[in-house]
Amino acid sequence: MKAGIEKWGKRMRRGVACSAAVGGLLMSTAFVGKEPSYAPVGKAHAQPAATPDFSLVGFATQNGGTTGGAGGRTVTAATLEELTKYAKSNDPLIIRISGKISAGAQGASINVKSNKTLLGVGATGFLEGVGLNISGQKNIIVQNLKLTMSTVTNTYTNDEGRQQVALNDGDCITIQNGSTNVWVDHCELFNLDPVAQPNQDLYDGLIDAKGNSAYITISWCYFHDHHKCHLIGSSDKDDADRKVTFHHNYYYNITERVPVYRFGTGHVFNNYYQHVYGTGVNSRMGACLKVEKNYFEDTKDPITTKNSAQPGKWDASDNYFTACKGNQPTTSTCTLTLPYIYTNVVTKTAEVKAVVTQWAGVGKL
């Protein structure tokens, strides 16, 4: 791993060839740092002419749907105290977050109760050292916010003998204890370059979901500079029938877990992966993931099942691989029929890179 990290950290581009597949066809080799030879991808960098459809799709539309604080008052939080007060209110609220809210080196964890929308104002909403804890709650939207735990120095020594942030399970956003109907959209989450900061446990997940949490959609977010991105299911004993959709997210400079997914069913489509050098989509413990129309670039084991007592499965189609290595399946090991319509938001595989890099993250709504 160390050698792989050092190689990646130097951004080596020496014409290492790998296969490229679209629509189940294995194409000719493509070279690292160059455009793939597959013809349609030549259009992938053209700027999309129109704003995409940003409406909610995926598992968060099920189980009664996800509306957040709709119907409640709209309030503005400019301080940590205001955000804490509004987030723990029993009333439905749309909480506008204006500017940077910082918890300093000590850090803070905000408990978010049901029927809330946390909405960043313009491109200014920034939670620095402030984690969001969604525990046993329902109907929550987190949108247009930037989050990091990288400023927190409040740590403890974990069971592996490594330092770990001592609040919010080390996560930027924790969804746990049976929380349902959560939509995280157009956010940016990051910590530190994993090459420069080698302790993989210091910050845990950017967004983790565990303990029977389900009906979650994570869309149009920018995740970067982090080791372990998404833990969906905390262990091989966390056997809930979880249901999570990931679409139109941009993953850059990530080690692994994009996501790691145990049990249940999931949907991973139209995401762009760039410089993911541990594992990509890692299906474990019998999970069946529909993985379609994603663009994988410079990614190790883009779709795989690893480090699991029981292998996971995938329903894979129309994914594109360039400058990748390891497992790049073009056939499926399970079949997943989804309970929702999403054709209105689907992007052609060849256009995913351009669309996602332009429209994912904060300030794009």
What do these predicted regions represent?
Residues 2-94, 104, 325-365:
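Extracellular "leader-to-stem" segments immediately downstream of a signal peptide or signal-anchor
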Residues 115-121, 138-151, 179-195, 203, ...:
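Right-handed parallel beta-helix
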Residues 84-92, 101-119, 125-144, 149-179:
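Extracellular beta-strand-rich solenoid/capping regions of secreted or surface-exposed proteins
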Residues 260-365:
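Extracellular beta-rich repeat passengers
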